[in-house]
Each structure stands twice: as structure tokens, then as C-alpha cells.
């Protein structure tokens, strides 16, 4: 059971799915209601007024929200995982950014920005794509490569020095570039900043910054959490499709014969297979997160094997969800092609999620190398 009281909010989100998609962003009043419910504070330390939930609880909540409305679930995931950086900031900076109980956060990990050291900070410019939920955010963040003397700065291990720079949302320009066929309501357009000064205290290194707050959550890998968040939204979306199909099948009579769809053998088989696939994928996620959580609670750095399992489970769940969505969409026949059908929207949403770099097919190779015991660059595990 969710530690948050979400049922009235979930009903509201479900009833306004058409509005969310038409707006191509999460309406401001809904974003405020979601903030009030605590959805954006799940991964913020308790010492900063956050919830600091166990990873699996946050993921289950993301599923619940996505089952109500996928775009709202996606925005929940992005804001929560963006706020995860709070566990790596000094306490004063953390309170400045994450102390507001109504704060909304967003960001893009991809290092599309450029950060040049200046005084006790960085002069930052950049433009980032996929800035989901940015129109409602109070703080935004973006990945940036550090340059010194015109050259990219390297870490001792030879990797580029990449930082997540955090800045007030008012300093960013938002660009209306989000014209997609799925996840339409996420407002995932571009954002940019030009020549802003970001204090060093608001520039987190994903490669070398150590947690500044206690707890197993902050020993989890950043990319593992992000990929699992995507998987949670995908699973919630696809599970909701099962209910949509069951509702339709009770009365739909396919051409040929008098039986409703629910009485057709092929529909029963397809529904059973989709259900089994989704429950199995969900179980793999739960198993992988549980194993990693046990290691993190022991105070250890997560093993490469545990980190690989997180990425593998996330990619498998996201792609399995899209396959199940295809099955359910097909079973609905011609009814699924109309815009009034929730099945067509969820089908589109499912397939947009598979395109995220954290769950793309390259993950199979990365985790397969670990399974074979081959030397593997574990940076993105």
C-alpha cells in the first residue's frame, strides 16, 4: 500500500487525461496538487523535509500514478529522480533548493551543456532536449561538461568531468519543441541557459560526488534509479491497459459470431500472456531492487553485478511493457484506433518510452558483458 494518500488525486488525473494530452504539458493546477501530495519529494532526504522512501516504494507509487495517467506518471518520475541529487549536496544548499515543500524539480542528465570554472562556481551555457515537466518546475538542472582553457577537463581516471548543474527555473528559456506521438502531456520540450553563473555548491559530479546524507537510497546508482523509474511508468501504463481491454471486451462483439470479445479464445490467450509477461517483468524489477537495497543497507558500494541487474530489469520491463501494449492494442481491434480509446494513447506512450537512452537496446550488450564476466565500463550502470 502506498505511504501517500493518493486515491482522490489519481481519480482526478485519470479524469483529466484528455486535458493533459491536449495541453501537451501537465496543467499547473494538477502539478500543484501532485506537489501537495508529496509525489516530488519521495527521494529527498528526511533531514531536508523529504520522504526518503525506500526505492521500491517510490517505484510502486510511480506505477500507480502512471496507471491513472501516463504523462503524469512520467512527470512524477522525472521530478523525483531529479531531486535525488539532494542527497549529494551540502545541507545549506540542499535546504535552499529542496526545502520548499511545494518545490517541483526537473532536469536532464545528458551533458549537453558547457561549464567553465569562474571564481567559486561555473559559467554555464547549454541547450537540453527532453526537459519533461519543466514548465511547472521551481528548479531545473542539466548535465554539463567542464572546460578549462578551451579543453575538456578530465578526471584522474581519464573520463570527462561532467557535472549536474542546478539553477532556478526562472533562469532557463523553455522552447516549444514537444510535438510527439506519445507521452504528449509531459511537456518534454527543450530548455536552454546562456552564460549563467552556477555556484560550485550546486554542481554535482555524478562520477565522484559522495553522498552527504545517510541512507541506503543514496548508495543506489543514479542511472539505475533513472532507468527503474522509466520501467515503473511503463509497467503502470501497460497494467492499466489490461483494465481498459477487460472493460471493452465485456461488450464488444467482433464481426462474425455472437460472442463478445471476452468469450473469444484468442482474446483470453492474449490477455493471459500479456498479464503473465507484465507480472514477471515486475517481479524481476522487485527482485533486482531488493538485492541492491540489501547491499546498500549493509553500507557497501553496490557490486557491478547488482548494478547490472538494475539496468537489465529496467530495460526488460520497459520493453516487455511495450510488447504487452501491442498485444492488448491488437486484441481491441478497430476500437483501439479512435482517439476516444485509452488503449491507443497508452499504446503510443508505451512505445515512446522505449526510445529513452536508459532503456534502449544498448543496455542488453552492456549487461550481457557483465554476465559473461568480461571487462566492462561500469560508468553507466
What are these model-predicted stretches?
Residues 181-278:
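Glycine-rich beta->alpha junctions and the first turn(s) of the following alpha-helix
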Residues 25-41:
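N-terminal glycine-rich anion-binding loops that anchor highly charged ligand groups
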Amino acid at each position: 500500500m502506498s505511504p501517500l494518500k493518493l486515491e482522490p488525486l489519481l481519480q482526478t488525473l485519470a479524469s483529466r487525461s484528455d486535458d493533459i494530452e491536449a495541453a501537451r504539458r501537465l496543467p499547473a493546477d494538477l502539478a500543484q496538487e501532485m506537489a501537495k501530495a508529496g509525489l516530488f519529494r519521495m527521494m529527498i532526504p528526511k533531514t531536508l523535509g523529504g520522504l526518503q522512501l525506500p526505492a521500491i516504494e517510490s517505484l510502486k507509487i510511480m506505477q500507480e500514478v502512471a496507471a491513472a495517467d501516463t504523462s503524469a506518471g512520467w512527470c512524477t518520475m522525472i521530478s523525483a529522480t531529479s531531486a535525488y541529487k539532494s542527497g549529494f549536496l551540502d545541507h545549506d544548499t540542499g535546504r535552499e533548493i529542496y526545502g520548499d515543500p511545494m518545490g517541483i524539480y526537473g532536469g536532464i542528465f545528458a551533458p549537453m551543456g558547457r561549464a567553465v570554472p569562474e571564481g567559486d562556481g561555473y559559467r554555464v551555457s547549454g541547450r537540453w532536449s527532453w526537459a519533461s515537466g519543466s514548465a511547472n518546475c521551481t528548479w531545473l538542472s542539466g548535465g554539463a561538461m567542464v572546460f578549462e582553457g578551451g579543453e575538456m577537463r578530465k578526471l584522474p581516471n581519464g573520463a570527462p568531468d561532467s557535472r549536474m548543474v542546478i539553477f532556478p527555473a526562472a533562469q532557463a528559456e523553455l522552447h516549444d519543441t514537444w510535438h510527439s506521438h506519445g507521452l504528449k502531456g509531459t511537456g518534454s520540450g527543450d530548455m536552454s541557459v546562456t552564460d549563467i553563473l552556477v555556484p560550485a555548491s550546486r554542481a554535482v559530479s555524478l562520477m565522484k560526488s559522495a553522498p552527504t546524507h545517510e541512507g541506503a537510497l543514496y548508495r543506489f546508482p543514479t542511472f539505475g534509479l533513472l532507468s527503474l523509474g522509466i520501467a515503473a511508468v511503463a509497467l503502470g501504463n501497460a497494467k492499466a491497459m489490461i483494465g481498459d481491454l477487460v472493460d471493452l471486451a465485456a461488450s464488444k462483439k467482433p464481426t462474425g459470431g455472437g460472442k463478445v470479445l471476452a468469450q473469444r479464445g484468442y482474446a483470453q490467450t492474449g490477455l493471459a500472456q500479456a498479464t503473465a509477461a507484465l507480472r514477471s517483468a515486475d517481479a524481476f524489477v522487485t527482485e533486482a531492487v531488493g538485492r541492491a537495497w540489501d547491499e546498500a543497507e549493509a553500507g557497501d558500494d553496490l557490486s557491478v553485478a547488482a548494478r547490472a541487474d538494475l539496468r537489465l530489469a529496467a530495460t526488460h520491463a520497459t520493453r516487455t511493457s511495450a510488447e504487452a501494449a501491442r498485444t492488448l492494442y491488437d486484441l481491441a481491434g478497430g476500437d483501439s484506433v479512435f482517439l476516444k480509446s485509452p488503449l491507443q494513447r497508452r499504446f503510443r506512450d508505451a512505445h515512446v518510452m522505449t526510445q529513452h537512452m536508459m532503456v534502449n537496446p544498448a543496455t542488453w550488450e552492456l549487461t550481457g558483458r557483465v554476465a559473461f564476466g568480461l571487462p566492462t565500463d561500469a560508468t553507466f550502470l
